[in-house]
């Protein structure tokens, strides 16, 4: 059995879609993949992911009967993940290596290299689901998520995500209005004891 530190398992999972590293992390966190999957389903319910049911921790669905989700639910999960900014230390890696350079990693999310502001997030491909992607990008103070499910090819999923993100950045922005404090008058409050 080969030893690998948690940081490298996270990197292998986020960058290279290493299912063995994903299972090892699940077992480390929860004791078993089954318990981890149960925790994932509980968390999905807490996040309002009404169309999601996990059967494993990898996303592989060839033998899974009811491993399902929706684009909306993936966006909810992605938004929650982005609250933990340190994840971007892994999801923005283009190329890296493990085991002292013996194992090379190239990010399965090609947008990391080719799309300005990409912060991640994750690709997935199975025969049932097709080529999928949760793409996240930030420009100025605007952070967007584009989810593509069921694409026929990897290239098409990236093109669809780029189109959605470009549209979002062209049409939306986070704006904080500047208000002159002197323009706001005094307010008198009366407290009534009942």
Write out the residue ranges for each language-model feature:
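Short charge-dense sequence patches
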Residues: 1, 22-32, 108-119
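Short, small-residue-biased leader/transition segments that mark boundaries at the very start
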Residues: 2-6, 194
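Active-site-adjacent helix/loop patches that line small-molecule binding or acyl-intermediate pockets
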Residues: 7-96
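Domain-terminus/edge residues, biased toward the C-terminal soluble/receptor-binding domains
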Residues: 49, 53, 65-192
């Amino acid at each position: 059995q080969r030893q690998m530190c948690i940081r490298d398992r996270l990197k292998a999972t986020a960058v290279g879609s290493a299912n063995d590293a994903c299972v090892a992390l699940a077992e480390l966190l929860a004791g078993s993949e089954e318990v981890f999957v149960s925790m994932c389903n509980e968390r999905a319910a807490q996040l309002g992911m009404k169309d999601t049911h996990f059967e494993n921790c990898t996303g592989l669905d060839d033998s899974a009967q009811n491993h399902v989700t929706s684009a909306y639910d993936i966006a909810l999960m992605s938004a929650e993940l982005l609250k933990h900014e340190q994840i971007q230390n892994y999801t923005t890696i283009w190329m890296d290596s493990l085991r002292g350079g013996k194992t090379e990693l190239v990010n399965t999310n090609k947008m990391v290299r080719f799309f300005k502001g990409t912060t991640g997030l994750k690709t997935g491909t199975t025969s049932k689901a097709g080529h999928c992607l949760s793409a996240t990008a930030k420009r100025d103070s605007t952070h967007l998520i584009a989810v593509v499910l069921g694409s026929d090819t990897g290239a098409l999923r990236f093109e669809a995500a780029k189109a959605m993100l470009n549209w979002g950045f062209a049409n939306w922005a986070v704006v904080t209005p500047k208000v002159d404090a002197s323009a706001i008058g005094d307010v008198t409050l009366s407290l009534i004891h009942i």
